[in-house]
């Protein structure tokens, strides 16, 4: 993990199928964080770029809908690992989904700033991101 990384927070209850895994928050890694030098296993969050969803919001934002089904239609599984890595463009689309959920809240501006910051750090063209998101 590096300072241009987002930690996406997901959950599901043990009684629910993996397909019900939902997103309940996201935060940028702190500007001075270097994963290779991390000794205590704690990922420090950026002071500003942190977004948390209410339970009602989170239950509408399912994690696995952001990924294409596998070629053999096997059930997607989180497995026993703590981290999943995926393209920054996928993360940018997830941030756009969070922004849409937060349209009528006091977190709307923060969500927009979060997207701008993430896209700038990762050299993602926001215009293309918006166009691709409108197709969905």
Tell me what each language-model feature is.
Residues 21-33:
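Short beta-strand-centered aromatic/proline hotspots
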Residues 7-9, 29, 45:
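Generic structural hydrophobic/aromatic packing signal, biased to beta-strands
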Residues 16-20:
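Short consensus segments that form the blades of beta-propeller domains
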Residues 36-136:
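Contiguous surface segments at macromolecular interaction interfaces
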Residues 7, 32, 54:
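Functionally constrained cores in energy, signaling, and assembly domains
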Residues 13-15, 32-35:
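Short, charged/polar surface micro-motifs in flexible loops or helix N-caps
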Residues 1-14:
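Short coil-to-beta transition motif at edge beta-strands of beta-rich domains
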